[in-house]
Curated annotation (Swiss-Prot):
Responsible for synthesis of pseudouridine from uracil-55 in the psi GC loop of transfer RNAs. NCBIfam families: TruB. This is tRNA pseudouridine synthase B. It catalyses: uridine(55) in tRNA = pseudouridine(55) in tRNA. Belongs to the pseudouridine synthase TruB family. Type 1 subfamily. Its EC number is 5.4.99.25. It comes from Shewanella denitrificans (strain OS217 / ATCC BAA-1090 / DSM 15013). It comes from the Bacteria. GO terms for biological process: mRNA pseudouridine synthesis; tRNA pseudouridine synthesis.
Length: 317
């Protein structure tokens, strides 16, 4: 017998403003509980030290979370100069202290080194896995694991301010970029060492900063719903962004209602105006109802790749 699903079938994306000191999984579980959702997943972990944007997908939106994992990110980071730690952040042990002695011109030259396409060796204190185990577990045991450099892109690296021994930067980068590693490498280039003392993710893909909500915000709404004897969804669900915002950068193909049945059966259908092997958003009818993503085959057919489950009352007969 199949296990009964617990929680509501609620679909959408919450832009959580994660607090410092908590894991991304803890934040995910709290959001899932607040919404009483039957399924939830986040779109790229933030370190416990870090705060900021953590998109959390609920219900059918989890099918598209990988596309947010692959999206560009933006961070505001403050580094403490003159001190290097074994984790490249303030959670680690100090391994070296040095005097700070560089000019603004030398700083700008160093920053330029990180802009554009580069190769980065991931930190040992990362969630990347080696033989099924996260690197940070090896690091905590004092074991150094060989890591290959990986290609990253830093689209923007902007100097914000330098106050005393604290340097603040704004970084727009590709997926898989480790800000702690950039900070540590920058400190070495400046000859003084550095580590992260504040890290805030300010953007994922094109999601708006002002749409973020904190766990405290959500908890307050849950309490309000209980006090007013309302269903929690009446106050929380309006905060959800549509699930197709996870693939908003994909081209759209709008199909007539008559094709809905065939698409939902996973059948390839005739379509035009699409490039071959490019993922697209599939919408149906005049209301442009999102039903999933597909790809154009070289035989001129649009093949569904990932489809949502449509409620029974909306399913085609």
């Amino acid at each position: 017998m199949a296990r009964r699903s617990k929680g509501r079938q609620i679909d959408g994306i919450v832009l959580l403003d994660k607090d410092t000191g908590m894991s991304s999984n803890y934040a995910l579980q709290r959001v899932k509980r607040f919404f009483n959702a039957n399924k939830a997943g986040h779109t790229g972990a933030l370190d416990p030290l870090a705060t900021g944007m953590l998109p959390i997908c609920l219900g059918e939106a989890t099918k598209f979370s990988q596309h947010l994992l692959d999206a560009d990110k933006r961070y505001l980071v403050t580094a403490k100069l003159g001190v290097r730690t074994d984790t490249s952040d303030s959670d680690g042990e100090v391994v070296q202290t040095r005097d700070i002695n560089f000019t603004q011109a030398q700083l700008e030259t160093a920053l330029e080194h990180f802009r554009g396409d580069t190769m980065q060796v991931p930190s040992m204190f990362s969630a990347l896995k080696h033989q099924g185990q996260p690197l940070y577990k090896y690091a905590r045991e004092g074991i150094e694991v060989p890591r290959e450099a990986r290609p990253i892109t830093v689209f923007e690296l902007n100097f914000i301010k330098l106050e005393g021994d604290e340097l603040t930067l704004d970084i727009h980068c590709s997926k898989g970029t480790y800000i702690r590693t950039i900070t540590d490498d920058l400190g070495e280039m400046l000859g003084c060492g550095a580590h992260v003392i504040m890290l805030r993710r300010t953007q994922v893909a094109d999601y708006p900063y002002d749409k973020m909500v904190s766990l405290a915000d959500l908890e307050a709404l849950v309490t309000q719903a209980q006090q007013q004897e309302l269903a929690v969804g009446e106050l929380l669900d309006p905060l959800l962004l549509p699930m197709d915002t996870a693939v908003a950068n994909f081209p759209e193909i709008n199909l007539p209602e008559s094709m809905l049945y065939y698409v939902m059966q996973g059948q390839a259908v005739q379509a035009s105006g699409l490039k071959i092997d490019v993922l697209v958003r599939i919408t149906i009818g005049e209301q442009r109802k999102f039903v999933g993503i597909g790809i154009m085959n070289d035989d001129g057919l649009l093949a569904p790749k990932r489809l949502i489950v449509i409620p029974a009352e909306e399913s085609p007969e």
